[in-house]
Amino acid sequence: MNRFKSIGWLLTSFVTILSGSTLAAHHEALQPVAQPGQVIVTYRGACPNEAIDKAITLIKETIAYERKNSPILYSSSPGVWSDGRIGAVDLHESQEAMEKAFAWQVADDKWSSMYEEIASSCGITIEDFEVDSLDSR
Protein backbone atom coordinates (compact mmCIF):
# COMPACT_ATOMS: atom_id res chain seq x y z
CA MET A 1 0.00 0.00 0.00
CA ASN A 2 2.85 2.40 0.81
CA ARG A 3 4.27 1.67 -2.62
CA PHE A 4 1.01 2.89 -4.27
CA LYS A 5 0.99 6.00 -2.06
CA SER A 6 4.56 6.76 -3.11
CA ILE A 7 3.75 6.28 -6.80
CA GLY A 8 0.58 8.37 -6.41
CA TRP A 9 2.49 11.13 -4.65
CA LEU A 10 5.22 11.00 -7.31
CA LEU A 11 2.69 11.18 -10.16
CA THR A 12 0.81 14.02 -8.47
CA SER A 13 4.05 15.97 -8.00
CA PHE A 14 5.11 15.33 -11.58
CA VAL A 15 1.76 16.48 -13.01
CA THR A 16 1.78 19.56 -10.77
CA ILE A 17 5.26 20.55 -11.91
CA LEU A 18 4.43 19.98 -15.58
CA SER A 19 1.16 21.87 -15.43
CA GLY A 20 2.86 24.80 -13.71
CA SER A 21 5.50 24.92 -16.42
CA THR A 22 2.90 24.62 -19.15
CA LEU A 23 0.76 27.36 -17.68
CA ALA A 24 3.77 29.61 -17.17
CA ALA A 25 4.74 29.20 -20.82
CA HIS A 26 1.33 30.04 -22.31
CA HIS A 27 2.39 33.67 -22.80
CA GLU A 28 5.48 32.70 -24.79
CA ALA A 29 3.41 32.06 -27.91
CA LEU A 30 2.15 35.64 -27.90
CA GLN A 31 4.51 38.07 -29.56
CA PRO A 32 4.30 41.86 -29.63
CA VAL A 33 1.86 43.14 -32.23
CA ALA A 34 4.65 45.18 -33.82
CA GLN A 35 8.39 45.48 -33.42
CA PRO A 36 10.09 48.87 -33.00
CA GLY A 37 10.19 50.65 -36.36
CA GLN A 38 7.15 48.89 -37.75
CA VAL A 39 3.95 50.84 -38.46
CA ILE A 40 0.39 49.80 -37.68
CA VAL A 41 -2.34 51.40 -39.80
CA THR A 42 -6.02 51.23 -38.86
CA TYR A 43 -8.96 51.84 -41.17
CA ARG A 44 -12.42 52.55 -39.73
CA GLY A 45 -15.63 53.34 -41.57
CA ALA A 46 -19.30 53.52 -40.61
CA CYS A 47 -21.39 50.75 -42.12
CA PRO A 48 -25.06 49.85 -41.58
CA ASN A 49 -25.48 46.57 -39.75
CA GLU A 50 -27.15 44.92 -42.75
CA ALA A 51 -24.18 45.81 -45.00
CA ILE A 52 -21.35 44.64 -42.71
CA ASP A 53 -21.06 41.07 -44.00
CA LYS A 54 -20.83 42.21 -47.62
CA ALA A 55 -18.28 44.90 -46.70
CA ILE A 56 -16.10 42.40 -44.82
CA THR A 57 -16.23 40.06 -47.83
CA LEU A 58 -15.11 42.95 -50.06
CA ILE A 59 -12.30 43.84 -47.64
CA LYS A 60 -11.11 40.22 -47.68
CA GLU A 61 -11.13 40.25 -51.49
CA THR A 62 -9.12 43.48 -51.48
CA ILE A 63 -6.58 42.01 -49.05
CA ALA A 64 -6.25 38.92 -51.27
CA TYR A 65 -5.67 41.21 -54.26
CA GLU A 66 -3.01 43.15 -52.32
CA ARG A 67 -1.20 39.96 -51.31
CA LYS A 68 -1.08 38.79 -54.91
CA ASN A 69 -0.28 42.10 -56.62
CA SER A 70 1.43 44.56 -54.27
CA PRO A 71 5.19 44.81 -54.74
CA ILE A 72 5.41 45.87 -51.09
CA LEU A 73 4.88 43.11 -48.53
CA TYR A 74 2.60 43.90 -45.60
CA SER A 75 0.03 42.15 -43.45
CA SER A 76 -3.65 43.09 -43.21
CA SER A 77 -6.60 41.78 -41.18
CA PRO A 78 -10.25 42.82 -41.63
CA GLY A 79 -12.81 43.14 -38.89
CA VAL A 80 -15.58 44.98 -37.12
CA TRP A 81 -14.63 47.50 -34.42
CA SER A 82 -16.41 47.46 -31.06
CA ASP A 83 -18.49 50.48 -32.13
CA GLY A 84 -19.81 48.61 -35.19
CA ARG A 85 -17.55 50.28 -37.76
CA ILE A 86 -15.86 48.08 -40.33
CA GLY A 87 -12.22 48.23 -41.26
CA ALA A 88 -8.83 46.63 -41.18
CA VAL A 89 -5.50 46.72 -39.42
CA ASP A 90 -2.31 46.70 -41.50
CA LEU A 91 1.24 46.05 -40.37
CA HIS A 92 4.09 47.60 -42.38
CA GLU A 93 7.79 46.92 -41.87
CA SER A 94 8.64 50.64 -41.70
CA GLN A 95 7.39 54.14 -42.39
CA GLU A 96 9.07 53.98 -45.80
CA ALA A 97 7.40 50.64 -46.61
CA MET A 98 4.02 52.09 -45.60
CA GLU A 99 4.51 55.10 -47.86
CA LYS A 100 5.46 52.81 -50.76
CA ALA A 101 2.37 50.67 -50.12
CA PHE A 102 0.15 53.76 -50.09
CA ALA A 103 1.73 54.96 -53.35
CA TRP A 104 1.08 51.56 -54.94
CA GLN A 105 -2.54 51.61 -53.75
CA VAL A 106 -3.18 55.06 -55.24
CA ALA A 107 -1.51 54.09 -58.54
CA ASP A 108 -3.32 50.75 -58.84
CA ASP A 109 -6.71 51.35 -60.49
CA LYS A 110 -8.13 47.98 -59.49
CA TRP A 111 -7.15 48.43 -55.82
CA SER A 112 -8.64 51.93 -55.82
CA SER A 113 -11.91 50.70 -57.31
CA MET A 114 -12.07 47.88 -54.76
CA TYR A 115 -11.61 50.38 -51.90
CA GLU A 116 -14.35 52.56 -53.40
CA GLU A 117 -16.63 49.52 -53.65
CA ILE A 118 -16.11 48.77 -49.95
CA ALA A 119 -17.06 52.34 -49.05
CA SER A 120 -20.02 52.35 -51.44
CA SER A 121 -21.37 49.09 -49.98
CA CYS A 122 -21.65 50.96 -46.67
CA GLY A 123 -23.13 54.13 -48.17
CA ILE A 124 -20.00 56.21 -47.55
CA THR A 125 -17.02 57.44 -49.58
CA ILE A 126 -13.37 56.55 -49.12
CA GLU A 127 -12.86 60.02 -47.65
CA ASP A 128 -15.20 58.99 -44.81
CA PHE A 129 -12.78 56.30 -43.61
CA GLU A 130 -10.66 57.22 -40.61
CA VAL A 131 -7.09 56.15 -41.30
CA ASP A 132 -4.63 56.32 -38.42
CA SER A 133 -1.10 55.06 -38.01
CA LEU A 134 0.99 54.09 -35.01
CA ASP A 135 4.79 54.04 -35.14
CA SER A 136 5.88 51.17 -32.92
CA ARG A 137 8.73 51.94 -30.55
Task: Annotate the PLM regions.
Residues 9-19:
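Bacterial N-terminal signal peptides
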Residues 114-115:
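Non-heme di-metal
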Residues 20-110, 119-137:
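Short S/T/G/P-rich N-terminal loop/turn motif that feeds into the first structured element of a domain
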